């Protein structure tokens, strides 16, 4: 986090020291998600401008992040009602969120992971709603009160789906894989629901169910296209235009390198029956 703040103010930092910068005068880089660096850096700048204190800026950031995290958790619990989960279960989950110290501490961390987790939680909830659209569900509370069951996926849920997908894309390096997987799965379920609705209608000579929108899967793919286009523009146009250096490719290779080093350090060779062997100097022989 300290490196991100220094990057935003164009001060030397640990990440810019080892990267081959596109412009030596621009120290902002993609080692950390650039969007998150901009968010926390802007809050610090606001604190300096208004209160003449960087700590005040961090308080602003922490307050906003804590509020967003609490709202996302509350929304996830609220969505359980639309999915037919009973009040006792929702109450237990809400109490767990409220009194488990881990969540309150986690919500105040100055790392990219918190806002990413918030965005991913919203994306996950919306994906589950889309997948459950064609399934029969129970709403005991509405039935007892004589009310109409709530709409599982309303118009505002499209906005939340887009925000969750974009947040997952830009708040973690390589985060595009999350909306890619979520939208593809959700679109497949939506298309399957339409197919089954028409199939049942053909068997019974009835009209297809109105509760299963015909073109919802196209909306999901449109959200995915928005994420792909936004990510392509940001990485291929915006960052080069502002001389923002991408993160090192060594990050992608860190896990294979770590596991290889661990294997060489702790094991004398591969399992029996496997051709390759590891020599004392660490080279792999076939």
Spans of model-derived segments:
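Multi-pass, polyprenyl lipid-linked donor-dependent membrane glycosyltransferases
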Residues: 61-67, 92-127, 167-184
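Short hydrophobic/aromatic helix or loop-helix immediately within or flanking a transmembrane segment
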Residues: 2-53
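Membrane-interface alpha helices of multi-pass inner-membrane proteins
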Residues: 157-172, 224-228
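Membrane-interface transmembrane helices that cradle and orient dolichyl/undecaprenyl
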Residues: 123-157, 188-196
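Transmembrane-helix motifs of polytopic, lipid-linked glycan transferases
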Residues: 60-84, 122
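Membrane-helix interface segments
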Residues: 54-55, 83-91, 153-158
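Membrane-interfacial entry segments at the cytosolic side of transmembrane helices
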Residues: 154-157, 197-225
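Juxtamembrane membrane-water interface segments immediately following transmembrane helices
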Residues: 1-12, 216-286
